[in-house]
């Protein structure tokens, strides 16, 4: 467990029992009970293998704002992080707000355990207005059959961290570092990670903007603004091509601007047609792609549809 001024984080550790060295976690009983009058700011999960190119749940649904408790999204719960506005029933009215903010989330998810979601209890244990939520495992059918909703872990083994952040204003919610504070590095980095600023044509021009001339214009824009990078989005493999990407990388380097490249994550788990495809789902192809990017000076990647 970890406790600080505005954060609480906890996880479960399962020890080996007699000769049993593996456990399958069928269900988690962690629950959060919020007081009556609490309102919610939540992102509902969609059913698996629906939506655009069967990519859901893709965590791109709209948040419901200042909504009442007791709902369960579109019957599939909510994606983390989950924000709640809690009323202080005994706080003084007037100058100071009588509300507080609570953020429930998770961190430390890796390949040994599944990510979770937040579900609303059908029958709140405290009565009231349905302010009881609990950790749910993934939906059956997600990822088109890749993986299992009940993780098997070698013992001793641990769950991801469950986190709660509380603040009288939204500042502690926005500024919390709890997702990083409790997670240990998996390996030593070759270089220090540095934050940077960049530009991105797709957010305005979408797929047609992913062409050589427009990306060169965005490199010039980033350089003029003092930004460090440009994100070249989907379809660069067909609308720009590898030789021209290398040329853009050289041009960007001359301007002090590095490139990030978009990749489709998919192997068998969705039908998203945008390329490059089938280069990030298998180790051999991924390593070859990373070597090529390193050789031409690409700074990093954006992986989509996962």
Task: Cite the ranges covered by each PLM segment.
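N-terminal accessory beta-strand-rich subdomains and adjacent acidic, glycine-rich linkers
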Residues: 1-175, 179
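Sequence-level detector for tyrosine residue identity
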Residues: 12, 59, 63, 74, ...
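Substrate-binding cleft of carbohydrate-active enzyme catalytic domains
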Residues: 195-306
